[in-house]
């Protein structure tokens, strides 16, 4: 089941690394990410997208079947999602996932409706479903289903002004399995 829009995004701690449960909550309560995938040549490709979390820990991304994201995932299922906090101080969380392309029409429309709600900040009504279904068919939309297996956190470390430089702290984060328990 698709999770509803979170009333309030999780705020990452600024004095320590995020716990595994906090990393999962960060992902579940935010809405945008940089979707990364391998290209045949050159460096990795990245796209800023809205994503929709599910109650069984998948992250769903809507795209067109002919776009690079879908083509690349069909070739190589390893992807990354750099989940972005849209508030100050900016935080991000890298999520590593295995992905598959799903073209089930009902899921495609559900995800497109959910993305529309995340973009506007309010869920779209059922009256939008026929329009979205027609658009999904015309654009040959698919869903990329991402199953996270690991995360890497980057703590927020920003200055509001230069006299805060002495208070700025740094620490080393690390990769943590997606389903890791809290210590």
Each model region followed by its residue ranges:
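Charged, gly/pro-rich active-site loop segments
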Residues: 1-18, 91-183
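Mobile-element integrase/transposase regions
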Residues: 16-28
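A generic local structural motif
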Residues: 19-22, 46-48, 66-68, 130-132
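Amphipathic alpha-helical interface surfaces
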Residues: 23, 69-72, 108-111
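Alpha-helix boundary recognition
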Residues: 27-28, 74-75, 136-137
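Short beta-strand segments
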Residues: 30-65, 73, 79-84, 92-95
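Short acidic (Asp/Glu) patches
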Residues: 64-67, 76-80, 121-132
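Short, surface-exposed beta-strand-loop junctions and turns on beta-sheet-rich folds
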Residues: 67-69, 88, 160-161
């Amino acid at each position: 089941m698709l999770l509803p829009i979170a009333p309030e995004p999780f705020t990452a701690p600024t004095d320590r690394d995020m716990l595994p449960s906090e990393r999962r909550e960060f992902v579940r309560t935010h809405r945008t990410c940089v979707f990364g995938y391998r290209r045949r040549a050159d460096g990795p490709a990245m796209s800023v997208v809205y994503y929709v979390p599910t109650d069984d820990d998948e992250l769903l991304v809507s795209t067109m079947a002919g776009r690079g994201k879908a083509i690349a995932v069909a070739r190589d299922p390893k992807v990354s999602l750099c989940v972005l906090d849209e508030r100050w101080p900016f935080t991000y969380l890298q999520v590593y996932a295995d992905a598959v392309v799903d073209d089930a029409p009902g899921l495609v429309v559900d995800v497109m409706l959910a993305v529309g709600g995340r973009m506007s900040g309010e869920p779209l009504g059922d009256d939008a479903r026929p329009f979205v279904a027609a658009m999904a068919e015309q654009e040959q939309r698919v869903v990329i289903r991402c199953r996270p297996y690991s995360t890497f956190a980057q703590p927020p470390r920003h200055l509001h002004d230069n006299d805060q430089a002495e208070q700025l702290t740094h620490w080393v984060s690390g990769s943590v399995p997606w389903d890791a328990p809290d210590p």
